[in-house]
Regions:
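Short, solvent-exposed loop/beta-turn-alpha elements that line the ligand-binding surface or hinge
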Residues: 1-8, 81, 155-158, 168
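Extracytoplasmic small-molecule ligand-binding "clamshell" domains
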Residues: 1-46
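Short helix-initiation/N-cap motifs at beta->coil->alpha
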Residues: 7-8, 22-33, 75, 110-124
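Alpha-to-beta junction loops
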Residues: 18-20, 36-45, 87, 105, ...
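Ligand-binding cleft/hinge of the Venus flytrap
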Residues: 1, 10-19, 96-114, 141-145
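Periplasmic-binding protein-like
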Residues: 64-71, 134, 141-168
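Flexible hinge/capping segments at coil-to-helix
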Residues: 60, 72-88
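Hydrophobic residues within well-ordered alpha-helices
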Residues: 13, 35-36, 83, 122-123, ...
Length: 168
């Protein structure tokens, strides 16, 4: 069963418009192609509204302001500079991956099909950090005192756009 903020919001929208909606779990980098080839009717998956994506699909008005955050083991790293030469997990095909590759090429990005898998590898010491949506990783911090934010929130609109929207 798929759970989370986006699913809860999508279910509320479906109820509001009296529609029967089905949900599927897909790799993030397959979402826009699935929409373009009409395998799905809408995508609601924490997707940043960026100029690059707006060239491919339409978006609703943003439903959530977005930022990103690095997370690592508690007490190990306090600044992003300390992650130079380290392995940081990202969800494959996301703006987080592009941001690190462009702005922090000295950090080794490790792509994952889901943030949950990146989180597991972080907790088990296979990677040094994860870079993801602030809303997602903040929940991890609440649930796991062994994890901590590394540096400040990142709000670069060139990468994280004008917020999260529903792609249609």
């Amino acid at each position: 069963q798929i759970v989370g903020f986006d699913v809860d919001l999508a279910q509320a929208l479906c109820k509001e418009i009296d529609a029967t909606c089905t949900f599927s779990n897909q790799a993030f980098d397959s979402l826009i192609p699935s929409l373009k080839f009409r395998r799905v009717e809408a995508v609601m998956a924490g997707m940043d509204i960026t100029p690059e994506r707006e060239k491919q699909v339409l978006f609703t008005t943003p439903y959530y302001d977005n930022s990103a955050l690095f997370v690592g083991q508690q007490g190990k790293y306090t600044s992003v500079d300390q992650l130079k030469g380290k392995k940081v997990g990202v969800q494959n095909g996301t703006t987080h991956q592009k941001f690190i590759m462009d702005k922090h090429p000295e950090i080794t990005t490790v792509p994952y099909d889901s943030y949950q898998n990146a989180k597991l590898d972080l907790q088990n010491g296979r990677i040094d950090g994860v870079f993801g949506d602030t809303a997602v990783v903040t929940e991890w911090l609440k649930d796991n005192p062994k994890l901590a934010a590394v540096g400040d929130k990142v709000t670069d609109k060139d990468y994280f756009g004008t917020g999260l929207g529903i792609a249609v």
